């Protein structure tokens, strides 16, 4: 049973429960880009992201990646382990795209010879600036051991998801992960894996099936999210209500 709201972010609300070691997460339809500068609603996004995350996190657990996920409660809600989020976001890149391609003068779609792992400070106010391990350790955001474990888990996520999506006709271009620490100090994957946090391209056409359709005003955002839901879970489209 969910109690008072503990936190509201751009895409989710987090509620306390009767168990102090568990939260309820509610997924919203709110869409933001450029650290909240651009805002809109994507019909059914909350349901779709909840469903995709609830499908993928148990598979990642089986693949050896501990997560905060416990169970899907409803169309928009899931029960999770309570964690303290580590304020270092991890980006894993298989292909040059987005800010990475722009920053380095690369053509979007350029394959990378090996996965690139980048770290950002989790701060909308500062625009999620890139940081390195020395900065994270020096400023107390994470320890060297934390970052070593986070990198190990992020690459394990990549090694599982890349072929998983490929088998469904999807190229996993890059993705963002967040990790948290449980009450007993275990580092686990938190947040979500969805078209909000990943770049997905159709393997045959390179059509974008993710939030870039919203960021870049490409249209067809709801249809792209519904298509990802269908390919990942086999479920149908979105609820228009």
Curated annotation (Swiss-Prot):
BP-aspect Gene Ontology terms: 'de novo' IMP biosynthetic process; cobalamin biosynthetic process
CDD domains given in the database record: SAICAR_synt_PurC
Domain of life: Bacteria
UniProt keyword Nucleotide-binding, yes or no: yes
Pfam family, one: SAICAR_synt
Keywords: ATP-binding, Ligase, Nucleotide-binding, Purine biosynthesis
Transmembrane regions: none
EC number: 6.3.2.6
Gene Ontology MF: a single term: ATP binding
Entries under SUPFAM superfamilies matching the protein: SAICAR synthase-like
Catalytic reaction list: 5-amino-1-(5-phospho-D-ribosyl)imidazole-4-carboxylate + L-aspartate + ATP = (2S)-2-[5-amino-1-(5-phospho-beta-D-ribosyl)imidazole-4-carboxamido]succinate + ADP + phosphate + 2 H(+)
Biological or metabolic pathway of the protein: Purine metabolism; IMP biosynthesis via de novo pathway; 5-amino-1-(5-phospho-D-ribosyl)imidazole-4-carboxamide from 5-amino-1-(5-phospho-D-ribosyl)imidazole-4-carboxylate: step 1/2
UniProt similarity note: Belongs to the SAICAR synthetase family.
Protein's name in the database: Phosphoribosylaminoimidazole-succinocarboxamide synthase
Natural source organism: Deinococcus geothermalis (strain DSM 11300 / CIP 105573 / AG-3a)
């Amino acid at each position: 049973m969910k109690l008072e709201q503990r936190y509201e972010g751009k895409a989710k609300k987090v509620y306390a429960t009767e168990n102090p070691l568990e939260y309820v997460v509610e997924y919203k339809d709110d869409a933001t880009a450029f650290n909240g500068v651009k805002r809109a609603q994507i019909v059914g996004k909350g349901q779709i992201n909840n469903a995709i995350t609830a499908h993928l996190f148990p598979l990642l657990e089986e693949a050896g990646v501990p997560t905060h996920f416990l169970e899907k409660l409803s169309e928009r809600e899931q029960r999770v382990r309570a964690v303290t989020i580590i304020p270092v976001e991890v980006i894993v890149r298989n292909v040059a795209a987005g800010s990475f391609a722009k920053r380095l003068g690369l053509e979007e779609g350029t394959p990378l010879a090996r996965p690139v792992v980048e770290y950002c400070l989790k701060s909308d106010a500062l625009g999620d600036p890139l940081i390195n391990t020395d900065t994270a350790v020096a400023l107390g955001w994470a320890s060297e051991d934390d970052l070593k474990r986070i990198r190990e888990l992020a690459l394990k996520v990549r090694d599982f998801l890349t072929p998983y999506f490929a088998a469904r006709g999807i190229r996993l271009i890059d993705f963002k992960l967040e990790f948290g620490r449980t009450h007993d100090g275990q580092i686990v994957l938190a947040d979500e894996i969805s078209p909000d946090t990943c770049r997905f391209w159709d393997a045959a056409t390179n059509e974008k099936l993710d939030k870039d359709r919203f960021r870049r005003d490409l249209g067809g955002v709801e249809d792209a999210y519904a298509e990802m839901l269908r390919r990942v879970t086999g479920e149908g489209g979105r609820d228009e209500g």
